[in-house]
Amino acid sequence: PLRLVGSEMCIRDSIMPDNRAEIEKRRTFAIISHPDAGKTTLTEKFLLYGGAIALAGMVKGKRNSRHAVSDWMEIEKQRGISVTSSVMQFQYDGFCINILDTPGHQDFSEDTYRTLMAADSAVMVIDAGKGVEAQTRKLFKVCVLRDIPIFTFINKMDRDSRSPYDLLDEIEKELGIGTYPMNWPIGSGVDFKGVYDREKDKVLRFIPEESGAGRREVQEQDFSLDDPALPGAIGEYLYDALKDDVELLDGAGYEFDLERVRHGKLSPVFFGSALTNFGVEPFLEQFLKLTPPPLSRQAEGRTVDPFAEDFSAFVFKIQANMNKAHRDRIAFIRICSGKFEKGMEVEHVQGGRRMKLSQPQQLMAQSREIIDEAYAGDIIGVFDPGVFSIGDTLCAPGKKLKFQGIPTFAPELFSLVRQKDTMKRKQFVKGANQIAQEGAIQIFQEINSGMEEIIVGVVGSLQFDVFQYRMENEYNVEVHMQTLPYSFIRWIDNEGLDEAALRKLNLTSDTKKVQDLKGRYLLLFSNQWSINWALERNEGLLLSEFSEN
C-alpha cells in the first residue's frame, strides 16, 4: 500500500475503489515564496495537520538540533535551507496531497522552475510586512506560463504588517493577477486579533500562545459579526474598522469566479500566521476544495486525460546520491494518467527501450518506502540506472506517447571550472555531467573544446557552493572556480545554423560563443546592450531565454 512514515495511508488495504475515485482525491501543488516568507513553516503545518509529522521544528541552521522535514542534503542541514526541491505526500480530510516544496532561500536553482512543471496549482506565500519580492516574481512567471491556479497566503500577520489593501494592490499591479480576499485580517502585529471569514460570515479570534507553535492545536474563538461580545473581544476601534472594511469589500462588486481561479487569472487570498498555526487549517480546507484534481497534460499531437486507462508519466527531477552509502540516483516522475503498479513494464520513449520499474518509492525527506501502486497526480521516485533525462516520457508499452519537453531556463551566473588534479579528469567529467543531468547546473563549452575546463551556469549563486561541495564530497575532486563577467545567455533558435554561420555573426568583442551538452549553440552576453547589438546587426537572428529539452 502507498503510504508515508507517520501518516495515514493514502490507499487502503480494503477493496479498492475505481481509479477515477483515487485520482479525483489527488491534489498536487507547489509552494512558492521569497526567502523567509514562512514557506517551510507553512509546509510543516500542513504535514502536522495531515499527521505526517508529530511536531513542527523550526529550522535555524546549526543552532537547532531539529531540521525541517523537507531538508535532507548535508549542505541543507548545515545551513538550514532547502537547496533541492522535496516531495511530500500525506492524507487530509479524504484528500491525498502531494506537496512539491521548493527552495525558499536567496539563491534558488533551475530545479525550482522545473518543479512547477509537475504541479497542478501553486500556493504563493507572501510576508505581510514585505509584500511581493524578487523571487516571488520569478516563480510567479513560470506559474503564469502554465496557466495553473495560484492561491495566496499572506503570512506573519502577528508581526508588523503593511495595509492589506496595499498588499492586494501590489499583487495585482506587480504580478498582473486579480485578487479576491477570502478572509480579512483584524489588526496586525501585537494588535492582531484574528480574521473575518467572508464565506462563513464569522470572526475567528486569534489568542496568542507561547508554546503552541509546534503543535496542531490553536487557541481561537468564533464570533458572528453582529455578536454583542465581539467589540469587547477585539476592541471597539478594531471592531469599527472591521465593519467598515467588510462593507467596503462587499460593496466593491468583485465576484468570486472559480473559472478565473482555475485558469490562473484570479488568486484567492488568505491572511494568517503559519508560525502560530492561526488560519492554517481553514486555509488548507478551503484550498483543497477550490484547487483542481490532476489536470490534463499536453503531449505531441494530443491531450492526455488523467482518467485515461493507460499509464503515463514524465521525469521532472533527477537526484543523485540521496543515500551516500549506496551512490544511488533517483528520478522523480509525475504520473499524468492511469494507475502505476509495482513491477509494471513501461516504455522509456526517449531511450527507445522497455523497462521494469521494480522499486518505486514514496519519499519524505530521507525516509523512503517501496510502494505497490500510485495514481495520476502522484509523484514517485524510481531508480535511475543513468538513462533518464529531465522531461523524458514513460508510458504503457506500445503507446509512443511523448509529453512536451520541460524548458531549460537561462542561467544568470557563470563560472569557469577545472579540476585541480589533472589525474582526476575522469571523476571530474563524471561528476560534472551527473550533476548537470540532474538539472542542478548547466554546462557549456567553448566551440571545439574538450572537458578540461567547462563553463558552469546557475540560476542562483548558492548552486556554485553546492556544486563544489558535491564534487569534493561525492566525487573526491577538488575544483578551481573563476567567476565570469557574464549576466545573460541565449540559445540561438535559427534552424540549420552551422559553425561557419556562427563565426560570421557580428557581435561585441566581449560576447562569447558556446555550446551546451546537446551541441546547441548559445551566446554569452555581459549586458543587455550586447544582446541588442547582436539582434540589430544580424538580421533574422533568433535568441531565446529557454530551450526545450
Language-model regions, residue ranges each:
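Single conserved hydrophobic/aromatic residue that forms the stacking wall/gate
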Residues: 1-13
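Structural and coupling elements of P-loop NTPases
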Residues: 12-549
